Amino acid sequence: MNVHVFATDYDGTIAERNAVSEATAKALERVRGTGRKLLLVTGRMLPDLQRVCPDADRMFDAVVAENGALVYFPERREVRRLGDAPEPALLEALRRRGVPFDVGSAIVATDAPFAEAALSAIRETGVERTLVFNKDALMLLPGGVTKGTGLAAVLGALELSPHNMVGIGDAENDHAFLAMSECAVAVSDAVPALRERADYVTRAPAARGVVEFIEEHVLRDLVDIVPRLKRHHLVLGEQADATPVTVPAHGTRLLVVGPSATGKSTLTGVLAERVLESGRSLLLLDPEGDYRTLAELEHVVVFGGKGEQALPAPDELDQLLRHPSTSLVLDLSAMSMAEKVGYATKVLAVTATVRAATGLPHWLVIDEAHHVLPAEGSPAADLLQPGAESLALITLAAGDLAPAMRRLPTVIASTDMGALHEAVLSARGARDLMSTRASGDGRALERGEAAIAWLARDPRVARFRPGTRRVLHRRHVRKYTEGELPPDRSFFFRGPTGSLNLRAANLARFVELADGVDEATSQHHFQQGDYTRWLRDQIKDPELAAEIAGLERSGLGAAESRRQVLERVRQKYAV
């Protein structure tokens, strides 16, 4: 995991008896010294915090105060209130009940024993306030305000991602911000409920636990803790017994292999959608324009192809990749092969730089990876060395990749069992190959089925059905709609007597000719199953071919069969 943010509570976590010790301050300074951002998340009011911790402005990149109702950026001395000021009617009702309290910019603070009286005052006045406990303290917060909402505002302002964040706390009011942390840590003397929900509990209490965690884990990018973070695993599908098939969100190096038109793109699309659904950022290099439909999902931007948005230059890409909520699909389908390789290499160089600085994008997916990382070697391979970031390479066969890339995977998925075994052999050697064979049953994969091998520890194989995609997949859209297929893959309208010789080298030309030939020619090819065979075998679209085959069995007349065939092709490929 790339830890770029360390968010901590104050009282009972880094501070004991109001103050931060010298040892704790030095540990926190070491975190910032590595370039990581240090955020303080506290229930205290800002003036009170600055009184008990005079070095707060120097120590922290941002402060979430008043339990999320106020945020403060020390470098620019900027304060933002995120909730309504305390209502005068509420304050008067509390005074009448003898409740002692302090007033912040948006918070009312008192002691836990006065909870009943505070709730009575809220009911009487009808204001929207939430009671939040912090051990012996009680806070009356504006509705919807938590430490989590305040921290989210800070992360947004600093363009940081919670998926690169560790959070540590000790009390009831820390639940919200720990829940949004990629790794939630509780000190050993935290309240029981917080310890139960945490991903990790320190051995030592309070500030000593924080120092322990920083020295043992934060400065090492959580390498020993990442395997525990199973709540973040991405579900690719399920086995026959409904067991989910997952890959870790962090540090996964996934290789997807298999012959053309067997479902690799579908499996890759499932992975991409699961990454996006989890709120992580994605960069997808798309040589054939297969993944443009991902733009239908929120926060996904497609560049290149025949679209309105040109591919970004390296400096523009550098800026785009630094937005944690934005994912990019770079469609290279309008380029020549040499141009694709050159541009992709520049993209990988920029991505390596941005990832080192920010941990973004969380996933890098390279389709047709053998073009950029060929078996004979490539300078681009040096830009993809093992790290904490996740990577997916998609290719026909492992042998098509540079040797270093064959050994890179921690997980291999395939739509063909033979290709899977070859990839495992390339990655781990004969011993692991025998192990994976022993774990699989040796049967060929059925259509719509895939297999996956986890290589990190004891290699094992599982057969599974990939999950359902949310958006329509259009395979090699530009290539088949506007490119030029060779004669042996083109469709020829010859008619029942063979007197015609009209070549359709792509789908756009096919639609044009099919719409213009006489009915006898159209019906001849329809009844002979020629359309079905071409769509299945040359366009590599078995789903559309199956639809047309269904029409062939329905006994449609010439005019209606032509209309329905064209309607389905146009709907699928927008030609």
Task: Describe each PLM feature range.
Residues 230-363, 373-392, 396-400, 405-408:
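P-loop NTPase catalytic phosphate-binding loop
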Residues 58, 390, 397-458:
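Conserved ATP-driven motor cores of ASCE-family P-loop NTPases powering translocation/secretion/packaging/pilus
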